[in-house]
Amino acid sequence: MSRINKNVVLALLTLTSSAFLLFQLYYYKHYLSTRNGAGLSKSKGSRIGFDSTQWRAVKKFIMLTSNQNVPVFLIDPLILELINKNFEQVKNTSQGSISQCTFFCVPRDFTAFALQYHLWKNEEGWFRIAENMGFQCLKIESKDPRLDGIDSLSGTEIPLHYICKLAAHAIHLVVFHERSSNYLWHGHLRLKEHIDRKFVPFRKLQFGRYPGAFDRPELQQVTVDGLEVLIPKDPMHFVEEVPHSRFIECRYKEARAFFQQYLDDNTVEAMAFRKSAKELLQLAAKTLNKLGVPFWLSSGTCLGWYRQCNIIPYSKDVDLGIFIQDYKSDIILAFQDAGLPLKHKFGKVEDSLELSFQGKDDVKLDIFFFYEETDHMWNGGTQAKTGKKFKYLFPKFTLCWTEFVDMKVHVPCETLEYIEANYGKTWKIPVKTWDWKRSPPNVQPNGIWPISEWDEVIQLY
């Protein structure tokens, strides 16, 4: 009996072991081999990356905007730069012909798109449909700065930004608004008190830290990772604009207060000068932009913008600043070709260069070239009859965009420091008598030109 029991037990153990072995073989063949095969197939390029959170969010967003006829275009600097580097590949790719996600699957927290607000016909309906599709959306609004000069309309609110989150990825929709002279503007993304600061990592947003101004881009449609999107026709021009896009508004409230204290000059002569000065500024901007030379409003023209949002009627000229490293040898010829003859040339490229051109109606264009030192910047001046040199010192500054007399132009971002350097703490008080050699608080003597150089550094026409 004992022997039989041992044989039975042995047989049962053998049978059980065999069954378990067969199960392992079956499991390996039908499960593990399938998984490994799928992984191998994926690694060989059969639709790699199209299950990524980023691509799925972008695809759903494009479906939403396409179905609702919302004309968005891609402005994400990272993706645009990648597209630009691989543009031949993108240009020759048709929808559905790709096997690998190259652009939209790049790890990141946001993808930035934009639209021009005047082309958006169904804003509220779009917002509701987006949430029905699974997006969690946040809308940022603020007062329309274009109406700040009009008391009765200055409280009107406009949409500035949408952030729509799907799973772990968010779409940042930047709303561009038209401004004068055909450029686009977006507002500051300022979070109100009730907004959840943990909704998305706001600090990683590439647009909205401050208002921005951009040239209106020409758009083209391309297929990127199997998705049809609009992008700027010159992607790198847009990308290069981003870090230099900061925009500051004219101070309309302070300008109104200024004119309550000091009545505006609306005489025929003042109106005529402002008209001529505006036309001269437009012509100068067109000429310098064509040359690719950046400039900013300087001296009295900058003071007029900052203090009264207008041209100072008794200034009698237009003042611009240019960094000396941006000087081009064909500047003089370009202005002459534009109908502005050279009135005088002082200094030289290496030291204290200054150009003056004669506009119509006796309005003069003065261009001051700025030189950078370790802890300050300066521009020079020259007295023609004596050869004396002067230097005007400014704290270091960067450039921002603004709007002035219906134009998009640069001004120093650190405007108050710039104005106070040139005009002192009493810059709010109009001064009609001004001695360029003594009045500015930042002027100092800078030697005298050797007589042997006068023919080069003092040229009057």
Swiss-Prot record:
One of its GO terms (cellular component) is Golgi apparatus. It catalyses: 3-O-[beta-D-GalNAc-(1->3)-beta-D-GlcNAc-(1->4)-(O-6-P-alpha-D-Man)]-Thr-[protein] + CDP-L-ribitol = 3-O-[Rib-ol-P-3-beta-D-GalNAc-(1->3)-beta-D-GlcNAc-(1->4)-(O-6-P-alpha-D-Man)]-Thr-[protein] + CMP + H(+). InterPro entries: FKTN-rel (IPR009644), FKTN_N (IPR045587), LicD/FKTN/FKRP_NTP_transf (IPR007074). The keyword Lyase does not apply. GO terms for biological process: protein O-linked glycosylation; protein O-linked mannosylation. The chain crosses the membrane at residues 8-28. Residues 29-461 are lumenal. Pfam families: FKTN_N, LicD. It is a single-pass type II membrane protein. Its EC number is 2.7.8.-. Residues 1-7 are cytoplasmic. Glycans are attached at N92. Disulfide bonds: none annotated. Residues 6-27 are annotated as: Required and sufficient for interaction with POMGNT1. Pathway: Protein modification; protein glycosylation. One of its GO terms (molecular function) is phosphotransferase activity, for other substituted phosphate groups. It is found in: Golgi apparatus membrane; Cytoplasm; Nucleus. Expressed in the retina (at protein level). PANTHER family: FUKUTIN-RELATED, RIBITOL-5-PHOSPHATE TRANSFERASE FKTN. Belongs to the LicD transferase family. Forms a complex composed of FKTN/fukutin, FKRP and RXYLT1/TMEM5. Interacts (via transmembrane domain) with POMGNT1; the interaction is direct and is required for normal POMGNT1 location in Golgi membranes. This is Ribitol-5-phosphate transferase FKTN. It comes from Macaca fascicularis.
